[in-house]
Regions:
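Catalytic phosphate/nucleotide-handling subdomain of diverse soluble enzymes
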Residues: 294-311, 318-330
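Positively charged, low-complexity intrinsically disordered leader regions
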Residues: 1-64
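A short, small-residue-rich loop immediately preceding and capping a beta-strand
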Residues: 58-95, 168-181, 280, 284-286, ...
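Alpha-helix C-terminal capping segments
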Residues: 52-59, 76-88, 106-107, 186-193, ...
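Active-site-proximal loop->helix
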Residues: 65, 74-131, 208-223, 246-250, ...
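Buried hydrophobic positions in well-ordered alpha/beta secondary-structure cores of metabolic enzymes
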Residues: 15, 31, 43, 66, ...
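Active-site/ligand-binding loops adjacent to catalytic centers
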Residues: 11-13, 125, 136, 191-284, ...
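Active-site/ligand-binding-proximal alpha/beta "capping" segment
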Residues: 135-180, 184-188, 248-261, 265-280
């Protein structure tokens, strides 16, 4: 086992795993499991990339407070990076995102400022901008910062190219949050693997890319207002209520071969099936990407190779509908197993 100088050196180099039970016959279906990053999501890459770029440029000063708007995963990644490097961190987050996320960030030393659920991502971004300007804090601007896709071009994309060197890679399937993974990896695949088709998934409730309606922007690239095609959806971390500038770059580059819309119920079904049939424990957005990959498989020629990105672990979804039907108490079947032998039974609960 390798030795590392600090936790940040362990970011990246996540495994590509073949799907054995859920893959359609005749298709080689793989997933890249970003939960293997130290804080459990693909956003660990972004967090390190934007902080190191700001240090190099001089934008971020020693001891300066860092601030970002986040649905959770970027904030968790930033909390790890800031703890390791010695920067205070404040995150703004809509109150609708899972409680686990805010607790994880606070456990890592960050301060979490909640914004009204009705104001969605637009509200938490506006609050972060306001706080940064008022207090002189460094705003990482994950939705516009070029260090985000650059990090994915240097790491995620290189890993994919290396893992499939000399082999077929017919389809690469991803979702989008900031668009960093989509745009960064697409830049490299278009140059080095032009044969690979790039497929992007988005929520059926928020078909912003599918609508072909342009996002209204301020001069600095930030959204001027929410996108008209957005409606709330259960895929936390996917598709904020605007099209990020970084995502729009991939659209403008015309690197996307296909856009799929995914229903929330299908995303959660795939998350559960990955856990129970493949032993792969991921969140709702990963289930959404996997649902998209299965859709691609339906029309892919025999022998095709499909790779889907799985952005995060499932543990930060315990309080969400993904776990809504998972009981804390023993089920009837579990009680029957318990009662099949005479000892060490729990006492019946009072009525």
């Amino acid at each position: 086992m390798a030795k590392f100088a600090n936790i940040l050196e362990t970011i990246g180099r996540t495994p590509v795993v073949k799907i054995t039970k859920l893959a359609p016959k005749g298709i080689n279906l793989y997933v890249k499991i970003e939960a293997f990053n130290p804080l459990g999501s693909v956003k660990d890459r972004l967090a390190l990339g934007v902080i190191e770029a700001a240090e190099k440029s001089g934008e971020l000063k020693p001891g300066q407070t860092v601030i970002e708007a986040t649905s959770g995963n970027t904030g968790i990644g930033l909390a790890m990076v800031c703890a390791a490097k010695g920067y205070p961190l404040v995150v703004t987050m809509a109150e609708s995102f899972s409680v686990e996320r805010r607790k994880l960030m606070r456990f890592l030393g960050a301060k979490v400022v909640l914004t009204p659920a009705a104001e969605r991502a637009f509200g938490m971004v506006n609050k972060a901008q306001e706080l940064a300007k008022t207090h002189g804090w460094f705003l990482t601007r994950q939705f516009e910062n070029e260090a985000n896709p650059d990090m994915h071009a240097r790491t995620t994309a290189r890993e994919i190219v290396d893992d499939f060197k000399g082999e077929r890679l017919d389809y690469w399937v991803t979702g989008f949050g900031t668009g960093g993974t989509l745009t960064g990896v697409s830049r490299v695949l278009r140059k080095e693997r032009p044969d690979t088709k790039i497929v992007v998934c988005e929520p059926a409730d928020a078909p912003m890319l599918s609508s072909h309606i342009a996002q209204e922007r301020n001069p600095d690239g930030t959204p001027a207002k929410p996108h008209p095609s957005f409606k709330p959806h259960p895929m936390q971390g996917w598709s904020p209520d605007f099209i990020p500038k970084i995502t729009a770059e991939a659209v403008d580059m015309k690197v996307i071969d296909r856009i799929l819309t995914i229903a929330g119920a299908d995303a959660m079904k795939c998350s559960r099936e990955l856990a129970q049939k493949e032993g792969i424990f991921v969140g709702i957005s990963a289930g959404g990407t996997f649902a998209g990959a299965l859709e691609v498989c339906k029309t892919a020629p025999a022998g095709s190779t499909v790779l889907a990105m799985l952005p995060d672990t499932g543990e930060r979804y315990l309080s969400t509908p993904l776990f809504g039907d998972i009981p804390a108490d023993m089920t009837e079947d579990e009680l029957k197993i318990s009662h099949s032998t005479p000892s060490n039974r729990l006492a019946p609960k009072a009525a």
